[in-house]
Amino acid sequence: MKKYRWLLMPILLFCSVWLLFHTVLFVGVVPSSSMEPTIPEGSIILGNRLVGSLGQGDIIVFRHEGKTLVKRVVAVPGDTVYLDDLDGSFTVNRETPNATRILTVPENCFFVVGDSRDNSLDSRVWENPFLTADEVIAVSVGAFPFASE
């Protein structure tokens, strides 16, 4: 047994790092330019998998329709979204005369959009506009942009 003791530390270290990245931390690559200029395409994003309550303005990583995406939460349960389908503009909890749809965010759901409004497929255009809490993988705690040049 003593001759295998040197293996114990690397195995424990590997298991600890694996557990950390599968239960607490998320590290991924931003797949599109929908969050520009805030987070450029190809940036490394670091997230916290221990998601508590989400609020307006939080940037989240989630799985939706088989894809891992990054968007900003703009409406939480109970909020009302006034959406203009003609130009994609919206307001939250503030009535607007141009609204073509009025949506109330259900419990355990969120309305999310990309910061690059003209370059984002998000809650404004999805058939079901609401992202469920179960689809959320992590809340962003930072991003590290990499130039594509």
Language-model features, listed with the residues they occupy:
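Extended hydrophobic leader/signal-anchor segments used for secretion and membrane insertion
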Residues: M1-E149
